[in-house]
């Protein structure tokens, strides 16, 4: 079936027998896809957890409106996203390389687009095992467009997280420490010479900042304890709200209508590393405007104008905006340009509430968020527990916990 497609940016969704489903960020080569998201009750995000018997839907908008057919494929990975040594039939039941057929045209918008939706599992594809997966999309010539990572959880252990200020005097004002407790009915079955256990931690849905631990600090029959896992606190996210697309607010000082809506943000000034100021955010996530009944197809797009004044010019470094809205993707699609000591950029955003940060990339390709770091900053941490018997060919996901650092102990 032909569908007009070109802008693809993905979202994936799932369920499975006794399994939860966990989603992460994705990789994109197409510049023509916007608003790819998993929609939960609270946020649109690149990361979600779904209990058994629930379906999840991936949604994305194509603004290019060219006719083409698109397909999705599934792959399985280990705990650090290296491809598993498995056949397709080991981890999926049904067909791989399925055509995406569910789409709708935008209605009553200045920016025309098609909204595509994929609900998984479906009649063509179901999942056999837990662990890390990706779903990738390609065109009918086999050209790769984008992929999204996700994980399926078969829960066998409960996880608890506690937050503390750093004990290291050097990092006392800038870092957060996590103590993680894994509760299992018989931890002896998960550890020892006959199997491997891996604990993975990420902050604010960024796989690039993952910490992987192979051994607990303390071991008991029904409990594993991991102590003093250290993260930079960072700072709260910048935000804007273009839900009411032709209105101004605290962050948008001007709007204008040309071929489509333009929204101008107040200048962002780089924060210096002195005093923490509380600024409520949603930890990098975003929320598409839901005051409209058919919000997937009736929300419009506006071009949002950014300006950022750094403390000093970054010489050869390139500056980008990142957040869950683009899966922290580094691409020219969200790059700012330097002019008279200020970085400028303008990018399309669907009506909604957005969190974002500025980051720099140096000549070596090293990624750094442009922000001070405070121990008080509220972040969202995700802990994943993977298990592999020596006789198995894959890592299963047996524990999951997502928690905000809103209560940090001294």
Segments predicted by a language model, with ranges:
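Aromatic-rich carbohydrate-binding modules that target alpha-glucans
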Residues: 91-116, 207-214, 303-351, 361-388
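Contiguous beta-strand segments within globular domains
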Residues: 34-76, 171-184, 294-306
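Ligand-binding face of N-terminal immunoglobulin V-set domains in extracellular IgSF glycoproteins
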Residues: 112-125, 130-137
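Low-complexity, Pro/Ser/Thr- and charge-rich linker/hinge segments at domain boundaries
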Residues: 28, 152-175, 375-399
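Bacterial Sec-dependent N-terminal signal peptides
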Residues: 1-26
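Short acidic/polar inter-strand loop motif in beta-rich domains
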Residues: 81, 125, 139-145, 244-250, ...
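Basic K/R-rich, polyanion-interacting modules in nucleoproteins and related proteins
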Residues: 264-315, 395-410
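Short, compositionally biased P/S/T/A/G/V-rich stretches that sit at domain boundaries
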Residues: 25-51, 156-169, 281-293
């Amino acid at each position: 079936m032909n569908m007009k497609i070109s802008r693809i940016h993905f979202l994936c969704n799932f369920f499975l027998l006794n399994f939860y489903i966990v989603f992460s960020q994705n990789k994109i080569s197409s510049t023509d896809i916007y608003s790819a998201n998993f929609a939960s009750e609270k946020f649109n995000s690149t990361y979600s957890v779904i209990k058994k018997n629930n379906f999840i839907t991936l949604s994305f908008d194509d603004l290019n409106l060219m006719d083409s057919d698109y397909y999705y494929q599934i792959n399985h990975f280990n705990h650090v996203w290296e491809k598993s040594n498995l056949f397709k039939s080991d981890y999926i039941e049904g067909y791989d390389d399925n055509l995406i057929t569910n789409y709708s045209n935008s209605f009553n918008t200045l920016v025309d687009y098609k909204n595509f939706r994929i609900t998984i599992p479906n009649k063509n594809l179901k999942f056999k095992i837990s662990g890390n997966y990706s779903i990738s999309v390609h065109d009918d010539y086999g050209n790769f467009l984008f992929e999204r990572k996700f994980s399926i959880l078969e829960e066998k252990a409960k996880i608890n997280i506690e937050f503390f200020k750093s004990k290291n005097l050097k990092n006392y004002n800038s870092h957060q420490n996590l103590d993680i407790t894994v509760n299992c009915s018989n931890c002896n079955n998960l550890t020892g010479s006959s199997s491997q256990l891996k604990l993975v931690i990420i902050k604010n849905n960024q796989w690039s900042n993952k910490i992987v631990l192979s051994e607990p600090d303390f071991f008991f029959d029904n409990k594993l304890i991991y102590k003093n896992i250290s993260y930079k606190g960072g700072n709260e996210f910048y935000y804007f709200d273009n839900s009411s697309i032709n209105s101004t607010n605290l962050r948008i000082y001007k709007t204008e209508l040309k071929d489509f809506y333009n929204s101008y943000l107040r200048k962002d000034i780089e924060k210096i590393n002195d005093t923490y100021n509380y600024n409520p955010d949603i930890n990098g996530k975003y929320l598409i405007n839901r005051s409209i009944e058919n919000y997937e197809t009736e929300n419009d797009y506006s071009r949002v104008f950014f300006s950022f004044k750094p403390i000093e010019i970054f010489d050869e470094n390139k500056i980008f905006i990142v957040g869950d809205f683009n899966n922290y993707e580094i691409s020219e699609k969200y790059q700012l340009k330097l002019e008279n000591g200020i970085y400028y950029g303008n990018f399309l955003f669907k009506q909604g509430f957005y969190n974002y940060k500025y980051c720099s990339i140096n000549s070596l390709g090293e990624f750094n968020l442009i922000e001070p770091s405070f121990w008080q900053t509220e972040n969202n941490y995700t802990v994943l527990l993977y298990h592999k018997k020596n006789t198995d060919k894959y890592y299963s996901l047996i524990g999951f916990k997502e928690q905000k650092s809103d209560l940090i102990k001294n």
